[in-house]
Amino acid sequence: MTRTAESGMLVAAAGVAAFGVTLVILAGGQTIDSRIGLTFAVMVAAFGTVHMAIRRWAPSASTVILPPAALLTAISLAEIHRLDPVRAGLQQWWLLIAAGMTVALLFFLHHRGTAAIRRYRYLYLLTGMILLLLPLLPSTGPLPVRGLEVNGSRLWLVVDLGITEIRFQPGEIVKLLMVLFLAGYLAERQSALAERPRQLGPFKFPEPRQLFPVVAVWAVSLVVLVVQRDLGASALLFGAFIGMIYTATGRPTYLLIGGVLTASAGYGAYRLFDHVERRFLAWIQPFQNFEDAGYQVAQAWFGMGTGSLAGSGIGLGRPDLIPNAATDFIYAAVAEELGFAGSLAILAGFALLIGVGFGIALRCRDRFRKLTAAGLTWVLGLQAFLIIGGVLRLVPLTGITLPFMSYGGSSLVGNFLLLGLLARISHEEPA
């Protein structure tokens, strides 16, 4: 696909967002106003700016990275506008900020290249650990920065700027830093990790000392789970690492080890933390616990059940009855109002992004770039699976965001930077 065709698809995605907002306004019996043009302009400005930056500083990058992300964002803006117009306005501001930060990243990588960022892997680890601990700061006090607990998990950082406050979720940046650290670490130790001199029954295992990084990252994930009480970030962090180590070695033994450690950590969390137990109950018995833990999931299923093939129509359903519909349950809201067709569009968008990401990783000859591309794709894919799977009751609810769709500035920034890294890697390792 040419860059011209890519730009046309981005404009079309902006049109989808504007059309969706138009339907929301008409469904509410309101008069057509400037919100439609503003939504279109913000989409064109954000994705157009990133598109031009890629043309300038990564011209050989894949042309199939931005369009699916633009489609997902377009559907999201329309649905968030339907659920909460104030949040929709804030999401548009965050979209512009995310695009600006991605342009800055592409400019930096144009001058330094991905080889330069490989040298600072331990700095990424240190920075990531500091960011993970920042939400543990006291919620009150004289400091302009403080932690904030939401829904039983301590994930948020609040920065007081005097005239306003900014809430940010450091974990969205930590996932990128951890991928960069692990890619640098595994690129150096790929051969040693691939060796399997010890055998236990039908399974072959590497030397115990080679398993140290697996256990260490599992321990870090447990710290996140215990201290921040965040099941989603813990599962995402460890799952992405297991995916990366499997990519580096091609040994399914690591998937087995990762599965055992994940199951044991999940069981421990279920027994130790009330809010994790509630999420398991919502997963297993949502309708039996309708008045309590299962209310959110049950309402989501009722809504999706009314969606049928084409949905009730955007602005005509009742996704507002689902708690946290704009964040945790945006997929259920879209499924109700756009039906199976809208759900399929979301799944197709993620499938395309994941396929492109792994395709970039497979083409890479450099180990670091290969593992970075694979790690970023594992993060994106696992995050989408955990939240959509939670809504569909394939896995317990984790409370993480759906990339490019859930309301939240930190999520949008983190995922746009992820796209920027993938674009740069695909430029350096063209098809």
Positions of the model-derived regions?
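N-terminal membrane topogenic signal
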Residues: 1-15, 61, 209
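Hydrophobic alpha-helical transmembrane segments of multi-pass inner membrane proteins, especially
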Residues: 33-293, 332-390, 417-421
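Juxtamembrane "helix-exit" motif on the non-cytosolic side of transmembrane helices
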Residues: 23-29, 80-83
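A juxtamembrane structural motif centered on a specific transmembrane helix
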Residues: 1, 387-431
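Long extracytoplasmic/lumenal interhelical loops at the membrane interface
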Residues: 308-341, 361
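Extracytosolic (periplasmic/ER-lumenal) interhelical loops and adjacent juxtamembrane/interface segments
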Residues: 159, 292-316
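Transmembrane helix boundary and interhelical junction motifs in multipass membrane proteins
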Residues: 230-235, 311-314, 325-327, 344, ...
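Long, low-complexity hydrophobic alpha-helices enriched in A/L/V/I and glycine
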Residues: 303, 309-310, 337, 407, ...
